[in-house]
A protein has these predicted regions:
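Rossmann-like NAD(P)-binding element
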Residues: 73-113
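Short beta->alpha hinge that forms the Motif I/post-I loop of the SAM-binding pocket
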Residues: 54, 91, 115-117
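Rossmann-like NAD(P)(H) cofactor-binding subdomain of soluble oxidoreductases
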Residues: 99-150
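NAD(P)+-binding Rossmann beta1-loop-alpha1 motif at the extreme N-terminus of oxidoreductases
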Residues: 2-82
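Hydrophobic Val/Ile/Leu positions in short beta-strands of Rossmann-like dinucleotide-binding domains
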Residues: 27-28, 89, 164
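Residues at the starts of beta-strands that form the adenosine-phosphate
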Residues: 25, 48-50, 134, 161, ...
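Phosphate-coordination loops involved in phosphoryl transfer and adenosine-cofactor binding
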Residues: 22-25, 84, 109, 159
Length: 241
């Protein structure tokens, strides 16, 4: 359902964004299935990547496999600041707010993207902190039922759609302002991140993304729950009006 927005409705400021770009060092916060798989892809491509994992055991396991991982968030973000790294937030939605506050404290100069499956709540947290200029939302449309570093694998995103939001550009253009070059560069970096991971970048607005994901991803779960309720009550004829 996301595919319908590939070539329509994109702001003029990003129409020329294309071709390969050089990724800066990439700092991944949260190394579960998605974050860990991104780390594996970037490492396999020979790019500079390091990260933080809340789970000490997960961080140790990743380190034993040869990846540059720490369980010290402030130290990792301070390093990202020194490197002017691209920060990828790959934690559950309930942890995003604390991560953003830590980024504001330790890496206020870094560009930020995320991989959270719903974009509006993240966008609201970004706006509340005045971070729109250095944020481009993302959502790789791939995954498995497993979680944690042990579930991550190289190639998880091959041929997957990777939604990339452009709402800040829309807001600038509606206000008659030029979209800052720094933001356009960041948008290009996130597109390149998707490409390196084998995915296809799909520009989309926050609202259109969430509408599409609700139809494609969440509706089956709602239907499954409804069917379970029907089954518990003995079939369709027994469901209360």
């Amino acid at each position: 359902m996301i595919e319908q927005h590939r070539t329509t409705g994109n702001p003029g400021s990003i129409a020329h964004v294309g071709g390969r770009r050089t990724l800066p060092a990439t700092c991944i916060i949260g190394l579960g299935l998605i974050g860990g798989s991104i780390m594996r892809d970037l490492s396999a491509a020979g790019l500079s990547v390091y990260g933080y994992n809340h789970s000490r055991s997960g961080a140790r396991t990743a380190s034993r496999e040869g990846f540059d991982v720490s369980d010290d968030l402030s130290r990792v973000l301070s390093r990202a600041s020194s490197d002017h790294a691209l920060i990828v937030i790959a934690v559950p939605m309930h942890a995003v707010e604390d991560v953003l506050d830590s980024i504001a404290m330790y890496a206020p100069n870094c560009g930020v993207t995320d991989v959270v499956s719903v974009k509006k709540p993240v966008d609201e947290l970004i706006k509340a902190r005045g971070m729109q200029l250095r944020y481009v939302g993302g959502h790789p449309m791939s995954g498995t039922e497993d979680s944690g570093w042990g579930a991550s694998r190289e190639g998880l995103f091959t041929r997957a759609a990777w939604a990339i939001t452009y709402d800040y550009a829309i807001e600038c253009e509606k206000a008659g302002r030029r979209v800052p070059d720094d933001w356009v560069d960041l948008f290009g970096q996130v597109c390149e991140l998707a490409r390196v991971c084998g995915a296809e970048a799909v520009p989309v607005s926050v609202d259109k993304h969430d509408e599409a994901v609700a139809r494609v991803s969440h509706l089956p779960h709602v239907l499954a729950e409804a069917l379970a309720v029907v089954g518990d009550r003995g079939g369709v004829g027994r469901v209360d009006a």
